[in-house]
Every structure is written in structure tokens, then in C-alpha cells.
């Protein structure tokens, strides 16, 4: 068993394909469903649980960060404490629903739940929950639109024109 499987037990046995370099804070708070993919240079700060359901894709250079800090300046200022240091960090879990795709250089902030079959655009910063079947983009990320059957058919047409084989799941069959 490799170091990664020791840190993240759910990464073995088909749980995830993870490309190096991969950075995490603890590893033990990261939970992968089956068939997840994590591209290179991703950072998972797992002070609280990070859960990726089945089939989640994570693009290159994505940050998934559960830590949070006080909003007010005087609460963050360590010089005000006698020891010169005070750790006011806390963490909130992150949950990403099955079939979602987090595109390159996106950031997912603590406390966020991303629904099933969502697309988070490249460079987006997700600070709020995302409903199922949505595309979000921007800083902060906002819902652009819902995904529907027409989107599924467009993907199907693209695959057929390029003669790319699709799995039964991608065709929407059981």
C-alpha cells in the first residue's frame, strides 16, 4: 500500500485516480466515492471532512479548502494576544455531489455543498451552495443556468460525430 492510500483510505480500490503533485493537510478527512479523478497540482485543506461522491472530476490546480477565519480584523490580529499568537481558525465541511466537474483553478470554500451533476467553471470561487444540475462561474460563483436533457443530447451528438465510445452511464441508461 502506498503513502496516499494510507493517508486517504478511500483512494484505493477504484476510489480515485490522483495525479501528482497532490497536496493535503491531513488526508484522513478526505472521502472519495468510486471513479473520482483528481488532476495535478490540487490542494485539499481537510481540517473538516471533504467528500467527493462517485464520479467527481477535479481539474488541475483546484483548491478545496475547509478552513475559515474571523471576518473582523481585530479578531484576526495576533499581536493583541499576550503570547503574540492566537489560532482563530475553524473549519466547515465541503461536499461535492456525484457526477460533478470542478474545472481547473477553481476554489471551493468551507461550508459549501455542490449538488449532483454540476459544472464549476475554470477559475470560479464557490462560496455558497450549488443546486443539482447547474453550471456556476465567476468570483464569487453564481449560477449561469441549469443543465437539462438538451445538454445531454449535445454531448451525445459530439461523441457520435467524433466516434468516441461512451459508457452506458454517459448515455443515460441503467
Model-assigned labels for residue ranges:
Residues 1-15, 139-174:
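Terminal amphipathic alpha-helical/low-complexity segments used for targeting or macromolecular assembly
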Residues 6, 30-32, 130:
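Short, T/G/N/S-enriched strand-turn elements that build extracellular solenoid repeat scaffolds
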Residues 22-32, 37-113, 139, 146-148, ...:
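Flexible, glycine/small-residue-enriched loop-and-beta-strand segment within the central core
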Residues 75-88, 123, 165-174:
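Short flexible/disordered coil segments
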Residues 79, 134, 156-158:
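A generic membrane alpha-helix/interface feature
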Residues 108-137, 141:
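C-terminal/domain-terminus segments
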Amino acid at each position: 500500500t502506498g503513502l496516499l492510500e494510507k493517508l486517504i483510505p478511500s483512494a484505493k480500490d477504484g476510489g480515485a485516480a490522483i495525479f501528482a503533485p497532490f497536496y493535503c493537510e491531513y488526508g484522513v478527512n478526505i472521502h472519495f466515492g468510486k471513479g473520482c479523478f483528481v488532476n495535478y497540482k490540487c490542494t485539499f485543506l481537510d481540517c473538516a471532512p471533504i467528500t467527493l461522491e462517485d464520479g467527481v472530476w477535479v481539474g488541475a490546480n483546484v483548491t478545496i479548502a475547509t478552513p475559515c477565519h474571523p471576518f473582523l480584523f481585530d479578531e484576526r490580529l495576533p499581536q493583541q494576544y499576550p503570547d503574540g499568537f492566537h489560532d482563530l481558525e475553524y473549519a466547515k465541511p465541503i461536499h461535492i455531489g456525484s457526477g460533478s466537474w470542478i474545472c481547473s483553478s477553481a476554489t471551493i470554500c468551507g461550508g459549501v455543498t455542490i449538488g449532483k451533476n454540476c459544472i464549476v467553471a475554470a477559475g470560479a470561487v464557490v462560496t455558497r451552495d450549488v443546486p443539482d444540475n447547474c453550471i456556476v462561474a465567476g468570483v464569487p460563483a453564481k449560477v449561469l443556468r441549469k443543465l437539462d436533457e438538451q445538454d445531454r443530447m449535445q454531448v451525445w451528438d459530439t461523441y457520435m460525430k467524433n466516434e468516441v465510445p461512451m459508457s452506458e452511464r454517459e448515455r443515460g441508461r441503467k
